[in-house]
Amino acid sequence: MTLVKSILLALAAGHVAQAQLNTAAKAAGLLYFGTAVDNPDLSDSKYLVNLETADFGQITPANAMKWQPTEPSQGSYTFTQGDQIASLAKSNNDYLRCHNLVWYNQLPSYITSGSWTNATLIAALKEHINGVVTHYKGQCYAWDVVNEALNEDGTYRQNVFYQHIGEAYIPIAFAAAAAADPNAKLYYNDYNIEYAGAKATGAQGIVKLIQAAGGRIDGVGLQSHFIVGQTPSLATQKANMAAFTALGVDVAITELDIRMTLPDTSALQTQQSTDYQTTTTACVQTKGCVGITLWDYTDKYSWVPGTFSGQGDACPWDSNYNKKPAYYGILAGLQSGSGSSSSTSSTTLITTTTPTASSSTTSATTTSATSGAAHWGQCGGIGWSGPTICVSPYTCQVLNPYYSQCL
């Protein structure tokens, strides 16, 4: 190696080390690079210090704005936890991406066990959305209005809202959110819609459903909970993003993490870095992909080990806040160049001006290999080393080459 080449490589290494993720994201044309946070994490001073750096320009409350914590009894609201995170976003001058208004999980018992009619549940749905969105009006850049409404085959989940209202609950929810805060971006958010298939087609159908009802939907959130070595290819992710943006909506990567089977190895870390780079590059190189959010940035607070037995180390920082190779994979993706990642929708973008996959927002869980994977759990796919049978009465069904699930 020549001396000149050695110097150039050293300079390049120094440049990468000094760059930071949100700065690089904005330079690439994205609005932000951010992370989900949960209220218990905020007592950790080192955690907070890292949030104040130029690595992050957006915050999502992981749990604090969901139905159970915000309206635990009907008509009685509590915003203490959500306000704490909104205040943090304001003090850091970050975008606040609010999460979420309507989900089948983390619902209070008065919703799940209520004696509802179509009319009374519609009224409760509208009242909840109006109460929460009005409280945070002007603070949220975007809302995940409806979260995870689909089964893996693209049909609607049989949740309490669908059972009493039908698919109409989705455009009703979007209309209520739009009325409460006309300037907030409104998203549908889900997992396993990052590649072409029945579920992605179902999500595109939700976009069309809202549009056909005369409503406004501004974007689709691609959660992107991936597995090391099984992340969809760059071409696959870009084509899938383009299928959504062709409908006139933005996309955002909303809950990114890439888990591995433990114990961690250098080879797994290298592959994880490549997988993070692939996903980041897909967003940067897709017009209409507006930003990327990690589902927490450090392994110390990751939801993965508590949900997927034997798996973890899914984040770009380790439990001691050291940057892993994944961090530099993200940075390389952000510096990969693009056409343009600007928004495809026409509503006004806002940042937080005054004070959001769920430590686990996905419903997939696993159990030990001896007992089989639980309902909705992963049971196969390229590189999968976990259980390949399901607990009764569920069966393992192949959804795509990367993912089989107990259904």
UniProtKB/Swiss-Prot annotation:
Domain CBM1 residue range list = 371-407
Signal sequence extent: 1-19
| Location of the region described as Disordered in the Swiss-Prot/TrEMBL record | 337-364
Q: Which Pfam families match?
A: CBM_1, Glyco_hydro_10
**GH10 domain segment(s):** 20-333
Provide the disulphide bond pattern.
283-289
UniProt-recorded name of the protein? Endo-1,4-beta-xylanase D
Q: What organism is this sequence from?
A: Talaromyces funiculosus (Fruitlet core rot fungus)
Q: What is the lineage of its organism?
A: Eukaryota, Fungi, Dikarya, Ascomycota, Pezizomycotina
